[in-house]
């Protein structure tokens, strides 16, 4: 197709949304002429499913709960006045608490203002807040954000080393809906130890975001933490960024959360419309369906040409893959659905994996994200009449063209500028696109049985570790190979896991296990040194 024909196709397939400063171009997706007509009936069903969801239908049958993240930016949509009042009350509480921290009404025990915050959470309790913090942060942040988003001791040590003595004026926000997430519990305990090592009371620095009457909630009440904010059972972790999970850290950082919510609300309003070609979330979902044949046949590559959107692909990775990656459909059929999502940022990626995208296996489609405003204020010229931002724009357009010339499909999202309102709109756009796509392929986007299976398996490993270490410490003076150890505790079938447990325990002095080298690693012998 020559460039003039592509221009006409671009004009025909550009979705423009002035209210949120966002355009979606689907012209470089090679869907057939009859595509929209053929799938319209299924798309209308997806609109109906979404309307039922927003109306309070039990969407997550596993847990018998509603799915109501859309109510967070439009409380009047909540199915009861009580829920609407709770949402409004919580938002007001977040704003008042943040204002108190900023004006010095709420201070650190030293009497000084809090200047930093440590957010402890994992999955949706970290990825959303991290994305927003990185996308909208600046040198003028009221509280500088740090994160414990894993149960990696070295990772937590690095964060604490960076905070250093400023821990005295650091607020810690612990986020866990159930209050029982082990990674978050571990991060909280590591943080508590760090405060105590400096002679500080953790409770005087701590805030909880959790479900009512959860173990974390009870701990916060018992210890007298600074504040508690709710996580409702009808908000899933990966769609919680416009709840207290994301709004509290953002407000404390100094981000305009009213603008964030307004962008999400306006995008919800647009993407609630039933005219498919005018609905950018519906178009996204349909392009995913076209590109992947509705069964995950191709990967989704996210290429934002903006440093501030670096973490967007990680955020979308969870939102999309945890929602869409399902073994069974709603009828119980094994379908193994999913779309793999990865990405980084342009033009960095042009010096990394774009080579394969253009000339390697064609197993993907690209979503480019273009931000028209380069920076606040005027840019210098790096060449006559050319700025650094002009180069970035040129690289984006060149990559898009080069990929399409070689039969690689792409979508392009264009936003006027990157601010809180735009970020809210992008979050809402993808949340709804995920819901529509799930309806198109007949799956439940709002549960995650695979995650629970992994947690249970981890528990089995830790129980086995307890048996292994207990036996070794009782058998003073004796040495065991992994196979001998497995036989001794009656876990012969778990010998590989026993071997991995022994390797890890012997590398960490706190466990009191030493190892002696053998002819091969499988001949290594392990003993207690306590």
Swiss-Prot record:
Upper taxonomic lineage: Bacteria, Pseudomonadati, Thermodesulfobacteriota, Desulfuromonadia, Geobacterales
A GO biological-process term: glycolytic process
Subcellular localization, as worded in the UniProt entry: Cytoplasm
Name of the encoding gene: pgi
Pfam families per record: PGI (PF00342)
Keywords recorded for this protein, A-Z: Cytoplasm, Gluconeogenesis, Glycolysis, Isomerase
EC category name: isomerase
Function: Catalyzes the reversible isomerization of glucose-6-phosphate to fructose-6-phosphate.
Reaction equations catalysed: alpha-D-glucose 6-phosphate = beta-D-fructose 6-phosphate
Protein name: Glucose-6-phosphate isomerase
This enzyme's EC code(s): 5.3.1.9
Family of this protein: Belongs to the GPI family.
Catalytic residues, chain numbering: 322 (proton donor), 351, 455
Coiled coil segments of this chain: none
